[in-house]
């Protein structure tokens, strides 16, 4: 093999796995990270090992094999054994557009997003698993709430000048809201949820018993009416509900009113609260009771008409059953499934509508065959006197109910009926599996989210003081040549300050080889001590400053890898301090 071919070869070490290809292969996708490796000055901008003559990237080696194959074949496939977010992150790192994924793998690639959207749709904490709060001290005592409160104190975000939480409202509003809205937030929230569930069941039971004749005795009533010449006594009989059922319903309404008012007052977003359908149901179910109580003492005709109307609309109380969705995951899953399967339901309705129209018309004309000459409407030997009546028969037949109130009586009508039944079975069976799959997906995701182990409280470190060497940077106290480091986000203003100081000291502005705002590059001249090779381990040397900070962590030489001059100019680093690894994200 000629020397030119050898110079065209390039070795890329990704996560310990060495990959070999040609520079011309990497140039097939200009503007990507691998295409920049083919540039002549790539050695100074990337993690290059001159001894092994290879570039090193601390990324996923399995995904990189598919990405490199994309440069070779021009087709990007998605591995089935890699989680979607990981593959998406790798594509973003290597600078490849996700729309380049082949159609055969697009659904596999999209699965993680569908799962994330499904998990986000559950959103609230009722599906968040949390351990039994046996040691909970009060409502809303959750780990996340304490972490947020601690973070507020640490970051001095409190309204009070002395660092205390900003008043009663700020302290108790989220706790009381979680107490009535999130049954899984604390032990006391569970008690409130059990009480609400009890009153819901009692209210629905009372509503059903009020319609039973045992609890609606017939009573004789007398009414005096004014007539022209005097008064007239009218006697009539009326069914009257037992008083104890009304009292029970009143107690339930008092609880629902208290619960509704507490949720309204302590709701963090009043507009979203009003738009919530469950909250509208709560209000509509409560209002008729108070109107009925307020108008019961009036004897005017208008008041009686309103009372009669309110007694009719008592059925809205049954809508309280939907409040159970706050307490049962399965009901919430069903609701999400119905919303996610809207297109399938519309498709099912369209199929049924077409079938109903076709078979209702066919059965009408099929039953008219053989009609007697003296019976032009064929009403004597068939039930299908017109096409609209056939709509009912077609719906009942296609859904395989078959009430038997209408049926064909001629051989041609029986043939149409058989075809209608078969078409109904096939039509309904097509969209149903999609709906069932949606339910299974939502239910499995809900169960997985509910069974997630409770996250431990995060350690919130004390913020370093101004002037401290650790101010807005991370110094890893690990042994020399360690490859592990913690990260600390660096403010953009501080990066600009470093660039300005570097420009003043070296007489030129630091240039970035990659236009990547998420990975800032500081290209600066180094002192002789700082010019020592960066090392990852005892056997690997790296020359040049850290450029791709996300490809790995770097260990600086014992002489110090951080400019002392910058410490004087920038508030980020107040004094010179030997560091083993500094990582900027």
Swiss-Prot record:
K(+) binds at residues 400-403. It is a multi-pass membrane protein. One of its GO terms (biological process) is response to auditory stimulus. Residues 121-147 are annotated as: Disordered. GO terms for molecular function: delayed rectifier potassium channel activity; kinesin binding; metal ion binding; transmembrane transporter binding; voltage-gated monoatomic ion channel activity involved in regulation of presynaptic membrane potential; voltage-gated potassium channel activity. Residues 1-190, 268-276, 332-344, 437-585 are cytoplasmic. Its main location: membrane. Zn(2+) binds at residues 77, 83, 104-105. Residues 130-147 have a biased composition (Acidic residues). It catalyses: K(+)(in) = K(+)(out). It is found in: Cell membrane; Cell projection, Axon; Presynaptic cell membrane. GO terms for cellular component: axolemma; axon terminus; calyx of Held; cell surface; dendrite; dendrite membrane; neuron projection membrane; neuronal cell body. Expressed in brain. Expressed in globus pallidal neurons of the basal ganglia (at protein level). Detected on Purkinje cells in the cerebellum molecular layer (at protein level). The chain crosses the membrane at residues 191-209, 248-267, 277-295, 309-331, 345-366, 415-436. It comes from the Eukaryota. The segment S4 is probably the voltage-sensor and is characterized by a series of positively charged amino acids at every third position. The N-terminal cytoplasmic T1 domain is involved but not required for Zn(2+)-mediated tetramerization. PANTHER family: POTASSIUM VOLTAGE-GATED CHANNEL SUBFAMILY C MEMBER 1, VOLTAGE-GATED POTASSIUM CHANNEL. Homotetramer. Homomultimer. Heteromultimer with KCNG3, KCNG4 and KCNV2. Heteromultimer with KCNC2. Heterotetramer with KCNC3. Interacts with the ancillary subunits KCNE1 and KCNE2; the interaction modulates channel activity. Belongs to the potassium channel family. C (Shaw) (TC 1.A.1.2) subfamily. Kv3.1/KCNC1 sub-subfamily. This is Voltage-gated potassium channel KCNC1. It comes from Rattus norvegicus.
